[in-house]
Amino acid sequence: MHILVVSVNYRTAPVEFREKLTFQAAELEQAMTTLQNQKSVLENVIVSTCNRTEVYAVVDQLHTGRYYIKKFLADWFQLEIEEVAPYLTIFEQDGAIDHLFRVTCGLDSMVVGETQILGQIKDSFLEAQQVKATGTIFNELFKQVITLAKRAHSETTIGESAMSVSYAAVELGKKIFGELTDCHVLILGAGKMGELALQNLYGSGARKVTVMNRTLSKAEIMAEKYMGHAKPLSELQCALLEADILISSTGASDYVITKEMMTKVEKMRSGRPLFMVDIAVPRDIDPAIDELEGSFLYDIDDLQGVVEANRAERLKEAEKIQFMIEEEIVVFKTWLSTLGVVPLISALRDKALAIQSETMESLERKIPTLSDRERKVISKHTKSIINQLLKDPILVAKEIAAEEGADEKLALFAKIFDLEMEDVESRAEEVEHKRAWTPSVPSL
């Protein structure tokens, strides 16, 4: 088995392409179910955010797995593989494990150290478990990753200087307008990104805030928390007339604000500039609006310059977290290496129990007067003897499994105990294809 990551992210793909490969939240479960039925794929978790779409998979063959995951992405988004391939980054084995740890800890984020990705990874993992797309390996790996990410943020100060993308948008607005107290701010979208932006705006002094959303009740709930006003999207054109700053993150599939709409609005704004930040993927605002004289549009990729400000301090903390990651990878790989010895141990236990069972049958034939209580006591004690005898050999087998040249040593181990290798290999296949669905996961 092999661990594989196929990624399209902000480092290698512009927003124009990333928005073509973005899974909507409502379709993630179906996507993971579909991928699970692809050739070579044994387990999978799909993570899709504004900055990345990544497929994490356990595959039986690397080459075949790579191909069918690429094909799945191309088919799902109705693209040709040739269109998708140039923007994909592939991580394999140790690189894939390290990448998952780094992403979940926020070290691979546009804003190093942000914590939003941890929640997104956890949500995707839980959804994958719900559709039984994860098995023995990912159930262990993702739990370990989530636990470490929580510890990394609690034991370092990386989160204190880190910014989310929505906070970066607010910082950009402050650089342009200075104080935000007198600015009229318009928020499009009442989801997580919109609320994060509003939290940061409120913390930066903004008090004239309007929240708009397709579902007005959601906008009202969010606006009430921060003493803002809520309006339906049907009044968008009027709201654009009043706004100084617009931050948009609706998750709509088409442009919410078109160039045609903004051209009409500009004529009525009497030359007042409008600062617009589009942090949605796919984008909410037609990029052609940036051509208009009074509109200043920034998308999610433009925020890179803002997030660089605190990078030096965050990188110091990131080094500490990377060390923690490397230690944790050793722990996971040790666990992973012992998976191969599980069938051997199982075969050893079964053989010992078979001997114990045969001995009990022989004893009962020779001493037919044994009472039920006496049989239970003898059976219990003979099993105890077996467990004591097997304890050290099993520990040694696990240690051998983590060493180089483990296959030859374990074969000798099997020979010493006269274990049938065909039986061991049969058990190994069962373990390899096992789908151990265990929904327990560390809470955030």
Curated annotation (Swiss-Prot):
<comment type="subunit">
    <text>Homodimer.</text>
</comment>
<comment type="function">
    <text>Catalyzes the NADPH-dependent reduction of glutamyl-tRNA(Glu) to glutamate 1-semialdehyde (GSA).</text>
</comment>
<keyword id="KW-0560">Oxidoreductase</keyword>
<feature type="binding site">
    <location>
        <begin position="49"/>
        <end position="52"/>
    </location>
    <ligand>
        <name>substrate</name>
    </ligand>
</feature>
<dbReference type="InterPro" id="IPR006151">
    <property type="entry name" value="Shikm_DH/Glu-tRNA_Rdtase"/>
</dbReference>
<dbReference type="InterPro" id="IPR018214">
    <property type="entry name" value="GluRdtase_CS"/>
</dbReference>
<dbReference type="InterPro" id="IPR036453">
    <property type="entry name" value="GluRdtase_dimer_dom_sf"/>
</dbReference>
<comment type="similarity">
    <text>Belongs to the glutamyl-tRNA reductase family.</text>
</comment>
<dbReference type="GO" id="GO:0008883">
    <property type="term" value="F:glutamyl-tRNA reductase activity"/>
</dbReference>
<dbReference type="GO" id="GO:0006782">
    <property type="term" value="P:protoporphyrinogen IX biosynthetic process"/>
</dbReference>
<dbReference type="InterPro" id="IPR015895">
    <property type="entry name" value="4pyrrol_synth_GluRdtase_N"/>
</dbReference>
<feature type="binding site">
    <location>
        <position position="120"/>
    </location>
    <ligand>
        <name>substrate</name>
    </ligand>
</feature>
<dbReference type="GO" id="GO:0050661">
    <property type="term" value="F:NADP binding"/>
</dbReference>
<protein>
    <recommendedName>
        <fullName>Glutamyl-tRNA reductase</fullName>
        <ecNumber>1.2.1.70</ecNumber>
    </recommendedName>
</protein>
<dbReference type="InterPro" id="IPR000343">
    <property type="entry name" value="4pyrrol_synth_GluRdtase"/>
</dbReference>
<feature type="binding site">
    <location>
        <begin position="189"/>
        <end position="194"/>
    </location>
    <ligand>
        <name>NADP(+)</name>
    </ligand>
</feature>
<dbReference type="InterPro" id="IPR036291">
    <property type="entry name" value="NAD(P)-bd_dom_sf"/>
</dbReference>
<dbReference type="InterPro" id="IPR015896">
    <property type="entry name" value="4pyrrol_synth_GluRdtase_dimer"/>
</dbReference>
<comment type="pathway">
    <text>Porphyrin-containing compound metabolism; protoporphyrin-IX biosynthesis; 5-aminolevulinate from L-glutamyl-tRNA(Glu): step 1/2.</text>
</comment>
<keyword id="KW-0521">NADP</keyword>
<dbReference type="InterPro" id="IPR036343">
    <property type="entry name" value="GluRdtase_N_sf"/>
</dbReference>
<keyword id="KW-0627">Porphyrin biosynthesis</keyword>
<dbReference type="Pfam" id="PF00745">
    <property type="entry name" value="GlutR_dimer"/>
</dbReference>
<dbReference type="Pfam" id="PF05201">
    <property type="entry name" value="GlutR_N"/>
</dbReference>
<feature type="active site" description="Nucleophile">
    <location>
        <position position="50"/>
    </location>
</feature>
<feature type="binding site">
    <location>
        <begin position="114"/>
        <end position="116"/>
    </location>
    <ligand>
        <name>substrate</name>
    </ligand>
</feature>
<dbReference type="Pfam" id="PF01488">
    <property type="entry name" value="Shikimate_DH"/>
</dbReference>
<feature type="binding site">
    <location>
        <position position="109"/>
    </location>
    <ligand>
        <name>substrate</name>
    </ligand>
</feature>
<feature type="site" description="Important for activity">
    <location>
        <position position="99"/>
    </location>
</feature>
